[in-house]
Amino acid sequence: AELEANFLSLQNEMIRSGITTFESKSGYGLSVKDEARSLAIAAKHTSETTFLGAHVVPEDYADKTDEYVALVTGEMLETCAPHAKWVDVFCDVGAFDVDQSRVILQAGIAKGLKPRIHANQLAAGGGVQLAVELDCASADHCTHLSASDIEALAGSNTVATLLPGAEFSTRANYPDAKKLFAAGVTVALATDCNPGSSYTTSMSFCIAVAIRDMGFSPEQAIWSATMGGAKALRRTDVGALSVGMSADLSILSAPSFRHLGYRPGVDQISQVLKSGKTIYKHQDGN
């Protein structure tokens, strides 16, 4: 009950910040029971659930990473797959290497899950190339990219999902979005809301940081936070206002969308609609 209450509290924060579609990952249980429990709760509230049993290597498996990979791809996957749409892995230094990550993602694919990946957050490595190899919907973070990484992303269907809240919270260097846009990479922006490295549900904050520190124009930031996010989930029903798409939108109490970057930290969400129905309306004085 406590876990679900916390989930709903964060969901309400997201709605108030203008978010209508979100992905929820596991990865903080790291046991069969706790990973399955967290996904089962998330699946009650969003269709975009991601099995991330391979988030980090638990202390009990510190010198036995391959044993943990076997658990993740065996009993844990079997138990969690019914509650998940996606499979994810943290492919980076101190977590899982490229070969281990490939095994984990391929096991998920074999169970009918769609792949995505945490890649190149802490250091350059082979995560982005693996994402392209396996046609991952998204490579999250993409902080440390080589020219060949950018070229590979540009020629693929994999979205580079940038997470400014993580760099802000950890005082890390920001990725250079200008290089990605110049190469024709599809870019998404997301909050990366998690208690370890980016405990924010504010999309407007992430947009402001992306504009200030990552080289986004206001137009690029808005597109990446909407259509880019939809493409990172391979959704065609959300992300824009167009005939045949869901009427999901946020109405701002501002003269221009540019104020999302111009006035960081200011609540400018007046109303939020999902499928044409109001799910949040700002009340003055509340």
Language-model features, listed with the residues they occupy:
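Non-catalytic positions within long, well-ordered alpha-helices that form the structural scaffold/packing
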Residues: I15, C80-A81, I109, V132, ...
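A generic structural signal for residues embedded in beta-strands
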Residues: L249-L252, K281
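Alpha-helical structural signal
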Residues: Q11, T73, I207, T226-G229, ...
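Short peripheral tails and domain-boundary helices/loops at the edges of structured domains
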Residues: Q268-G285
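Structural motif
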Residues: T20-T21, E48-T50, K85-D88, A137-S138, ...
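Active-site-adjacent C-terminal substructures of enzyme catalytic domains
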Residues: K114, A124-A240, A254-R258, P264, ...
